[in-house]
Curated annotation (Swiss-Prot):
Gene field: ahcY
Protein name in the entry: Adenosylhomocysteinase
Residues bound to NAD(+): 198-200, 232, 265, 284, 319, 340-342, 385, 467, 471
Organism: Bradyrhizobium elkanii
Function as written in the Swiss-Prot or TrEMBL entry: May play a key role in the regulation of the intracellular concentration of adenosylhomocysteine, which is a strong inhibitor of SAM-dependent methyltransferases. Catalyzes the hydrolysis of S-adenosyl-L-homocysteine into L-homocysteine and adenosine.
Pathway this chain belongs to: Amino-acid biosynthesis; L-homocysteine biosynthesis; L-homocysteine from S-adenosyl-L-homocysteine: step 1/1
Catalytic reactions on record: S-adenosyl-L-homocysteine + H2O = L-homocysteine + adenosine
Origin organism lineage: Bacteria, Pseudomonadati, Pseudomonadota, Alphaproteobacteria, Hyphomicrobiales
Length: 473
């Protein structure tokens, strides 16, 4: 399977991998009932006809099913991965072979990563996208940073706080020189909205909304119950140990593991390690989450307590500098260190660059300290489940990506009479319950139905929604 004749608007590792990718996409479709039902329901209506979606989300087999669902609903699409290690090259090849522009290679450099992200906005024919589908907020951030600089505030471009920021700001400067005056403003004006996949990207959106700098409406897909309580929790429960095992081949049973953070991702990660036979410790700043961890039977400690005791360390906080170089100096010889939060700054990777690195295999490095003790770093502190394994299973991603599809429809087709202002919204409970319903039959669930008198008794409709908006699942 090769790309369509004359179609060259893609960058992938090897287009010859497309046949392999297509076979795996076919398998994934069977495990993604929500997306397939969405195609069947909305396909004839073409609600995304005219949508030009700039997508920045891990270019996996499951994402390929999402991309082709959006295309089946009428959208025109350009796509990049949101992480330098998360691309599955056969998935990217299959999408390119289908004639959809995609720019994603597993192991791309940071410079390549940001160059590819910029390609999202170089629409064929000289137009711009009118929708963003984001994971982590990098595509959204590029538009906002460029717009800010166009408005005359350029001082921040000379104050990078990391290697990646230096590369990112250099890209913004280059685009300001190369593109027509007001290019970023034109993009911002044309964007009808963004749907954001993950906790970290949502934080960025709320920060901008609170400051009044958000340039277009946003839907927070992450906080849909059928995303955060399934993808973040059950997805991590399956994929974390998969990444650690593929990366290291260590026996997990009997090991001491430390999980930093006990939100939904941390809960899933701790459960993953416990089910593998680890003795699990947890650190938390939130007293509620700390109490939850203790009530689940985990030992709640600080990272300082855990550093010399644990064999495996996992960060899952969405915050920075969770594991510092001081913590790593105190670790056992060949302790395993990894991250399952969105960005790599949860671990102080930059502070290790002047030490001796020995690459064991792709995304597995041994780092030696001056005292000769070593640690094993997975995926250079980036997402371990996608860098060292294949990410979450298709079924749980179907729920997340069905939410993404509904959010894109909502922002593009249903934003009548300025229904959505430049704020952050969540999908209504009715759609959350709909997404859940679409996945029940696949796993043999028989749902009990309320009688009218029962529904009246608890003050809900027979068809739902069954919980208030503030209900905590």
């Amino acid at each position: 399977m090769n790309a369509k004749p004359g179609f060259t608007d893609y960058i992938v590792k090897d287009i010859a991998l497309a046949d392999f990718g297509r076979k795996e996409i076919s398998l994934a479709e069977t495990e993604m009932p929500g997306l397939m039902a969405t195609r069947e329901e909305y396909g004839p209506k073409q609600p995304l006809k005219g949508a030009r979606i700039a997508g920045s989300l891990h270019m996996t087999i499951q994402t390929a099913v999402l991309i082709e669902t959006l295309a089946a609903l009428g959208a025109d699409i350009r796509w990049v991965s949101c992480n330098i290690y998360s691309t599955q090259d056969h998935a990217a090849a299959a999408i390119a072979a289908a004639g959809i522009p995609v720019f994603a290679v597993k192991g791309e450099t940071l410079t390549e990563y940001w160059d590819y992200t910029a390609k999202l906005f170089d629409w064929h024919g000289g137009g711009t996208p009118n929708m963003i589908l984001d994971d982590g907020g990098d595509a959204t951030m590029l538009v906002h940073a460029g717009y800010r600089a166009e408005q005359g505030d350029t001082a921040f471009l000379d104050k990078p706080g990391s290697e990646e920021e230096e590369i990112f700001y250099a890209l913004v400067k280059r685009l300001l020189k190369e593109k027509p005056k007001g290019w970023f403003a034109e993009i911002a004006k044309n964007i009808k909205g963004v749907s954001e996949e993950t906790t970290t990207g949502v934080h960025r959106l709320y920060e901008m909304a609170n400051k009044g700098t958000l340039l277009f409406p946003a839907i927070n897909v992450n906080d849909s119950v059928t995303k955060s309580k399934f993808d973040n929790l059950y997805g991590c429960r399956e994929s974390l140990v998969d990444g650690i095992r593929r990366g290291t081949d260590v026996m997990l049973s009997g090991k001491v593991a430390m999980v930093a953070g006990f939100g939904d991702v941390g809960k899933g990660s701790a459960a993953s390690l416990r089910q593998a036979g680890c003795r699990v410790m947890v650190s938390e700043v939130d007293p509620i989450c700390a109490l939850q961890a203790a009530m689940e039977g985990y030992e709640v400690v600080t990272m300082e307590d855990a550093a010399p005791r644990a064999d495996i360390f996992v960060t899952a906080t969405g915050n920075k500098d969770i594991i510092t170089i001081e913590h790593m100096r105190a670790m056992k010889d060949r302790a395993i260190v990894c991250n399952i939060g969105h960005f790599d700054n949860e671990i102080q990777i930059a502070s290790l660059r002047n030490l001796k690195w020995t690459n064991i295999k792709p995304q597995v490095d041994e780092i030696e300290f001056p005292d000769k003790h070593r640690i094993i770093m997975l995926s250079e502190g980036r997402l371990v489940n996608l860098g060292n394994a294949m990410g979450h299973p298709s079924f749980v991603m179907s729920a997340s990506f069905t939410n993404q599809t509904l959010a894109q429809i909502e922002l593009f087709a249903n934003n009548k009479d300025s229904k959505y202002a430049k704020k952050v919204y969540v999908l209504p409970k009715t759609l959350d319950e709909k997404v859940a319903r679409l996945h029940l039959a696949k796993i043999g669930v028989k749902l009990t139905e309320l009688r009218k008198d029962q529904a009246d008794y608890i003050g809900v409709k027979q068809e739902g929604p069954y919980k208030s908006d503030h209900y905590r699942y």
